[in-house]
Amino acid sequence: MLKDTFTLWNLNNPWRLGAVVAYYAVLSLPGFLIVVINSVGAFWGREIVQGEITQQISEAIGPDAAKSVVEIIENSRNSDKNLFATIIGIIVLVFGATGVFYQLQISMNEIWSVKVDPKAGIWKVIKDRALSLAFVMVIAFLLIVSFIASTALTVLSGFLSRLWEPALVYLAQIFEFGLSTAVLGLLFVLIFRFMPDMKIQWSSVWLGGFMTSIMFNLGKILLSFYFGAANPNSAYGAAGSVVLILLWVSYSCLILFFGAAFTRIYTEKYEVEIHPQDFAMKVEIEEVVVEKGCDNPPEEEEKK
């Protein structure tokens, strides 16, 4: 099954899909961060949330990228606007925050070989944007849960360290890794369930979602080591932080798309037959070779 998963994953050119999502992730970053920080900050405190996000980014891709993200947040907040400009700004902010999920949905549809019916019209676009906004809010909710749990675990680790029980401290760290895997797994389950325009059952997405979560957490650790040792942003000067964000999102998408391919293979092998949504259609892409080079024997046509 892993062989079939890799074949499907590679067939859909995940590097291209990851690059597209990474590009839109950078464009969506200001709106996404402001929406999440304001949403979670209403319960937890904006400065605390911003500090936690900055710390996570610093651990994942380095302090330079984290500093750039802080500047993006501050610049988005400090712009002086009148009432009309503020309303337009909010609309643009929400539209920008949902852009990366909209592109992610398009990529998921490619992996599932499904396409939106052109007759679906504007209501399909509105529905997709609403779904993307819902995912932003889901992430905000999961961040609240994660912050509460992380705070509790930090207090617990400090208490255990004072007892001079290193094994218990390591146990708390393992539990924190498991908690992170569970939270991310739930997010990936929701992505695999609702993002593709397919009628997918809940039973089809649990294994793929949590497998992707484990790979994502392990990949995050490996990427942090790579970024720390190789320092790939040094060759790009002032644009280095943006390049790091692009690389991190692109590499993360490779894992996400592998999980999506696994979910499709698993569903087609073990679950009931699934069908596209009412506004979508299943597609098959066929390559037709109409001409070969001179070194190849002449053939009229070859289909793959």
Language-model-derived ranges and their functions:
Residues 1-304:
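Membrane-embedded alpha-helices and immediately adjacent juxtamembrane helical segments
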